[in-house]
A protein has these predicted regions:
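Active-site-adjacent structural elements that line small-molecule/cofactor binding pockets in enzymes
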Residues: 1-289
């Protein structure tokens, strides 16, 4: 199992030196990857019609692919993971170009987690349809993979038209791994059919194992091998008392099919980026051995 960290988007602040130091410390501790959340816009909770989302315009969100360009130069081994990028509110060819550039600058260290999103405000502001986002994401992935693996691409789809054109440079990974987030059955079936992996939100245990086994069944139905399909869990330290970290970690390691895990330090009241690093050091000592 590869164990990484969740970048503390809403708590890390805006100091580039602190962000660099955080990433380098994570890499030096031996964590394998850094996973970054994505939101382009935050809504005003006092807007007409109200607001029920967990984030507002007051929460800091560094743009993941721009951030990865910075982190690519600051690190050497750390895998750079979007978890997730809200793909349908973006233009697919542009994302393919941006992702390819990150992959080149990082020496092939990008993993692109994508999902359909839930924030209609962002879709409206970015000029994309919220209603069709589920249908469009599959064609977007197909278009991006073509652009990542061919010098010239000809596409005439329902949502995309590329008249014999391509991106340059192509990425190091051809294609870049695409994982999907989301919990509904239709989303999980889509991931099993078209993605390289899935990013769920659950605690380890028998109920989670039942879900993983069901997903592996969907993968087989799609004519694919579960051994080639990754699943990344999320260990939120705010949900588990420190005295139970080792036990929870053992439960994760005991699950079949979990290939990756990200340790999440947001929500603990940590006041600085350095405090997040210290918490990850403590977790490594007490839970990873």
């Amino acid at each position: 199992m590869r164990i990484g960290v969740v970048f503390p988007q809403v708590e890390i602040g805006q100091d580039p030196s602190a962000i660099r130091d955080y990433a380098q410390a994570v890499e030096a501790m031996g964590y394998t990857h850094v996973l970054v959340f994505d939101h382009v816009l935050g809504a005003n909770p006092e807007r007409p019609g109200g607001w029920k989302g967990p984030y507002t315009f007051r929460h800091t969100f560094h743009e993941p692919l721009v951030l990865f360009g910075f982190l690519a130069a600051a690190t050497r081994r750390l895998e750079l993971v979007t978890g997730i990028l809200i793909l349908p509110q973006r233009q697919a060819a542009l994302v393919a170009k941006q992702a390819a550039t990150v992959d080149v600058l990082s020496g092939g260290r990008l993993r692109l987690g994508v999902a359909v999103g839930w924030n209609a405000v962002e879709f409206e502001a970015l000029g994309e349809s919220f209603r069709t986002r589920g249908r469009r994401i599959e064609e977007q992935i197909e278009v991006m993979r073509a652009l990542w693996t061919k010098d010239l691409v000809r596409v005439q789809g329902q949502w995309h038209s590329i008249p014999d054109a391509g991106i340059n440079p192509l990425p190091v990974q051809r294609p870049i791994p695409v994982w999907m987030g989301g919990e509904s059955d239709v989303v999980v079936r889509r991931a099993a059919r078209v993605a390289d992996g899935w990013m769920p939100h659950f605690r380890p245990g028998s109920a989670a194992q039942t879900v993983v086994d069901r997903v592996h069944g969907y993968v087989k139905e799609a004519g694919r091998a579960p051994v080639d399909f990754g699943i990344e869990g999320r260990f939120a330290l705010s949900q588990v008392p420190a005295a139970e970290w080792a036990q929870e970690m053992a439960a994760w390691r005991g699950m079949r099919g979990i290939t990756h895990l990200s340790v999440h330090t947001v929500g603990l009241g940590l006041p600085t980026p350095a405090a997040h690093v210290e918490m990850l050091e403590r977790f490594k000592k007490e839970a990873l051995g």
